[in-house]
Amino acid sequence: MCIAVNYDSNQYKVVVSIIVPVYNVEKYLRECLDSILNQTFKDFELILIDDGSKDKSGEICDEYAKVHSNITVVHQNNQGQAAARNNGVEISKADWIMFVDSDDVIHPDLLQFLYKAATESNSGMAVTERFKSETIPDDFFRQYTFEYAVKKTIPEKLEEFYDNKQFYYWAPFPSIIKKSVAQSVPFPEGKIYEDNAVGCQLLYYANSLAVVPYCMYFYRENPSGTMNQPLNEKKLDYLWALEEQIKFYEELHYVKMCKKITNELIGSTLYYYARCKKENNDKLLEIVIKDLKRFLKQYRRYIEDKDKVIERKTDRILNPRIYRIKKVLKIY
């Protein structure tokens, strides 16, 4: 790991550390960095983790670091986004952490609003809404009046976030988090969907959440993203992430959420099964069927007896003869 440090501690008061994992994003990186550097809140350091980029992203990071003394650049061999985030937290100087993806754009007042909401409410995390699209909307940079609401992150409230798909509840952005919370829940390395795996834990250990009710984070949607690409074994990490959520709620003895996540786990596995059949991916199909059998056995206690949809679909895959009999007898 090579670290280029251009930070002058006498010039800046470091209140927030903004961590940006960077990998092959030369097309959008400048726009992202400019939006961060144009924040109305200035007491931050910017940590750029170049995760072994093969394009000019690393050079762009160094170029900005030469001009802006609050930027630290880390060049490392490719280790993945989770390791990049964890390494950024490790070297950060502030008590608050913010993660920004390197192809995204943030509103000029985002950091000011989040920090003020978190500190005024004594919350461990503050969050805003995000806008997901291929292009930035015309009114994205409009002015807002500062306001926030506070929510406790007890298990019942996490359930509400999950049901409403609120704040993209499992993701570490768009938010600021106390460094102590981020350190207590490091991102699992070597996996994708790592934010899905630990997002609910970050919320829980924050104790309370300050919510700024505006869309102040632009999440750049990739038109050739995961949903439009052929399946591979790595994408099955989503199932692993859901299992991590189940394990977390098991530790809290919160059966209701275990049931909800198990339902999503089985549904997602059935979705992957259908994708494998459609793409004639027999090798991956074997893995999916094996996973499905294990999930049904391991988490059977969380599957409602009345859920005939899951029963019908899993019987059709794993027990086709029983499926045909039940269908004739109209048991489903």
Which residue ranges define each predicted feature?
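N-proximal low-complexity "stem/linker" segments adjacent to membrane-targeting elements
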Residues: 1-37
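Glycine-rich, basic loop-to-helix element that forms the pyrophosphate-binding segment
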Residues: 76-92
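Short beta-strand/loop segment that forms part of the nucleotide-sugar
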Residues: 43-52, 72-77, 101-102
